[in-house]
């Protein structure tokens, strides 16, 4: 929020050395002078990127950019206001070569899934969106804190928070089939995995039918749970769960390190203490391996 109390939208590029000892900012573009919240960025091709974010009026936007391979030039190509009511808690994934699916919280924080086509030059076309009046409202109680991942060629798993039975917001994983052209979106199955609360979700695939979810649970503690999800999305089963931080586990970002090791970056303290922890996640209950120190 350099120039705006609301918080402008910015894309920046960095070079990071192979050993992690140097991190240098290369370029920066203020692409929205009003607001740029709840960002989800994906690569379209070698130099084109798509960003879902909440912009002016809290509306939902998709914008595309070309970014040079050295990061020195960042250029906005196209922009689409896909939801004129609200567009927060975005999670954008690629469906096929030019089709993309977006899970987000819309009006009244209800859960929506929309689809778009984005061609190699960055042109965006609405397929199933609120602006077209034809997207999927999959949860009418709440659909925030989303994390969407691909299960197979046309099946997707979405971790999110709803509040059907709890004012705090239970943890849910639902599956959907989405056609390769984005014209059909169908809910398949749903599992309420935490009856208390599940915020700040980050879902990753472990193997063809195993998934790991980092989230903020009871008492704001940090949890990692594992699930099996069938390739057609019809069965979702919780396998194991680990309460890895009994103080705080906010703003999670979980990534794979190798075949069974995962790193989690999260807010671990009352004053925004950043932490990185590693975990061994196989097909059973995950366990913590250690914490990661900064590179000097």
Stretches with model-predicted labels:
Residues 1-296:
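Extracellular, repeat-based ectodomains that mediate carbohydrate processing or recognition
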């Amino acid at each position: 929020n350099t120039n705006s109390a609301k918080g402008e939208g910015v894309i920046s590029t960095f070079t990071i050395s192979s050993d992690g000892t140097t991190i240098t900012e290369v370029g920066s573009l203020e692409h929205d002078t009003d607001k740029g919240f709840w960002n989800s960025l994906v690569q379209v091709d070698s130099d084109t990127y798509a960003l879902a974010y909440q912009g002016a009026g809290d509306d939902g936007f998709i914008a595309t950019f070309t970014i040079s391979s050295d990061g020195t030039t960042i250029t906005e190509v196209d922009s689409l206001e896909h939801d004129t009511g609200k567009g927060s808690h975005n999670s954008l994934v690629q469906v096929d070569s030019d089709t993309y699916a977006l899970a987000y919280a819309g009006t009244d924080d209800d859960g929506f899934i929309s689809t778009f086509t984005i061609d190699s030059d960055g042109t965006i076309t609405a397929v199933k969106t609120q602006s077209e009046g034809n997207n999927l409202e999959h949860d009418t109680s709440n659909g925030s804190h989303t994390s969407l991942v691909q299960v197979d060629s046309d099946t997707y798993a979405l971790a999110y928070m709803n509040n059907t039975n709890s004012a705090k917001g239970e943890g849910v994983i639902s599956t959907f089939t989405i056609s390769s052209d984005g014209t059909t979106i169908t809910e398949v199955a749903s599992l309420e995995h935490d009856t208390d609360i599940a915020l700040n979700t980050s879902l990753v695939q472990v193997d063809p039918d195993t998934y790991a979810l980092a989230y903020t649970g009871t008492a704001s503690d940090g949890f990692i749970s594992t699930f099996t999800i069938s390739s057609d999305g019809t069965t979702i089963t919780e396998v194991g769960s680990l309460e890895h931080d009994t103080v705080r586990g906010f703003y999670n970002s979980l990534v794979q390190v190798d075949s069974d090791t995962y790193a989690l970056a999260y807010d671990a303290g009352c004053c925004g203490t950043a932490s990185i922890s590693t975990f061994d996640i196989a097909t059973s209950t995950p366990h913590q391996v250690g914490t990661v120190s900064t590179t000097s």
